[in-house]
Design a protein with these regions (language model features):
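Sec-dependent signal peptide recognition
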Residues: 3-10
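C-terminal motif of bacterial Sec signal peptides marking the signal peptidase cleavage site
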Residues: 15-18
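N-terminal hydrophobic targeting signals that begin at the initiator methionine
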Residues: 1-2, 20
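Flexible "stalk/tail and boundary" regions
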Residues: 20-435
Length: 435
């Protein structure tokens, strides 16, 4: 069935989109933390129970916490994104993230996952691809999808008709000089099903991305880390560790581009996006704020990027954007010998970094089997995960995340488990330390 929508509907759509991006954190999540670590902060205690195979985990590789507190785990062993609440229960509605496959029905083994404010769940598999699944679309259901539209140039008044999916359509849809005055939507069930399922968001093999990525080989990228800004920024960042003759070690910005208009079962009109190469944020080097064999990445609420790497000479970096020009220029926020977080002696193999809501940094080391914690200024605070700070030894911790309560979640790929820790002086009454 087809129907037309007008410019008035598009204006309503713009309002609707702004509303659907709102994300309310449940009231039962305790976020009354003091901020910086203090002298009274004592020991990281392990929380019971250990989340293991009884919680449907097999080989957890990465972990992310959505703004509603739900926990998303990239589980390479069972080709799934495992979703848990803060009690370890499996909420309904996320069955589409299990047993992941691509368009060729080949299994997808996710190695990283993140969730943005629009309820987009992004994940990567170590290739040049980024996949996505939208929670809101699946909760609401998709009724119709745009198939064509008539666009009008704002200054000249010229009209142009475009078919959805064509180069002309994508160009006009993303050009602020053109607006939709009339469109046609259709309930194409095959297309609806493809959007409801996990699907390809970005592909380095795409001709446009190869063209835009002038100095590197976009089609050979090997994404090792992924992060999505917490607010309304229409972009994600990935670390590329392909290497090769051109030292393709870098951080890449992927921009959102409008691709379709969706009418949900609720009547809301929302955009569907595809990813397009936006630029190399930082490239290869061995000094502060450069990239060499990157492993993971995270972003704070100010847009500062934090990443770990295996190459020379510093395992941990933070870069911050200067937005005064036409495009962001990133500069190192930490310096060797001045900031303890850049001292390589703290780490043997720093695999992942995560931030809490106060920009304190948590770094997991799979060789040392521990977590090293630094405050937002880069000063050392404490170790967690071994010795006096833990009653159980992690075997091969590989990733971590921190929720609004300050609970630290650590993936251990060797025993298919997630360990949880919290400072002993900030334990909630409903959290039980390990006996």
């Amino acid at each position: 069935m087809k129907n037309k929508f007008s410019l008035f509907c598009v204006l309503i759509m713009i309002f609707t989109i702004s509303c659907t991006e709102r994300f309310v954190i449940p009231s039962d999540i305790d976020s009354d933390n003091s901020g910086q670590f203090g002298a009274g902060d004592t020991t990281f205690l392990q929380i019971s129970p250990l989340w293991d195979r009884a919680f449907d985990l097999d080989q957890p590789e990465e972990i992310s916490i959505a703004q509603d507190g739900r926990i998303f785990v990239a589980d390479k062993g069972n080709n799934s994104i495992v979703v848990l609440d803060q009690n370890g229960n499996r909420p309904g509605g996320f069955e589409g993230l299990r047993n992941l496959t691509d368009l060729n029905q080949d299994e997808i083994s996710p190695i990283d996952v993140d969730v943005d404010k629009k309820m987009n769940v992004f994940f990567i598999d170590g290739s040049q691809r980024i996949f996505m699944w939208n929670q809101y679309w699946n909760e609401s259901g998709i009724n119709k999808i745009s198939t064509s539209a008539t666009f009008r140039h704002i200054q000249t008044g010229a009209d142009t008709m475009a078919i959805a999916g064509t180069d002309l359509w994508l160009s006009l849809l993303n050009d602020s000089d053109w607006g939709i005055i009339e469109g046609v939507m259709d309930s194409d069930q095959a297309l609806i099903d493809s959007l409801m399922k996990p699907h390809l968001f970005y592909d380095g093999n795409d001709e446009m991305n190869v063209y835009l990525d002038t100095y590197y080989e976009s089609d050979k990228s090997q994404f090792t880390g992924l992060t999505a800004p917490a607010d309304n920024e229409n972009m994600v960042f990935v670390t590329d560790s392909y290497g090769g003759l051109n030292n393709q070690y870098r951080i890449v910005q992927i921009n959102f581009k409008r691709s379709l208009i969706l009418e949900l079962e609720s009547g809301d009109l929302v955009w569907s996006y595809v990813g397009q190469f936006g630029g190399t944020v930082k490239g290869f080097g061995t000094g502060a704020g450069t990239v060499n064999q990157p492993l993971s990445i995270d972003v704070d609420y100010q847009g500062n990027l934090y990443y770990t790497q295996a190459g020379d000479y510093f395992p941990i970096h933070m870069i911050y954007p200067n937005l005064s020009g036409d495009f962001a220029i990133y500069t190192s926020g930490f310096q060797p010998e001045a900031d303890e977080v850049m001292d390589p002696s703290w780490f043997t193999n720093a695999l992942d970094i995560a931030l809490d809501e106060n920009k304190n940094m948590y770094v997991v080391d799979n060789v040392n089997s521990d977590v090293t914690v630094f405050d937002s200024k880069g000063d050392y605070f404490k170790k967690a995960g071994y010795g006096q700070d833990s009653l159980k030894l992690m075997i091969e911790p590989c990733a971590l995340a921190v929720d609004q309560r300050g609970v630290v979640y650590v993936c251990d790929r060797a025993n298919g488990s997630i360990y949880r820790y919290q400072l002993s002086n900030s334990l909630d009454e409903d959290i039980t330390p390990e006996d």
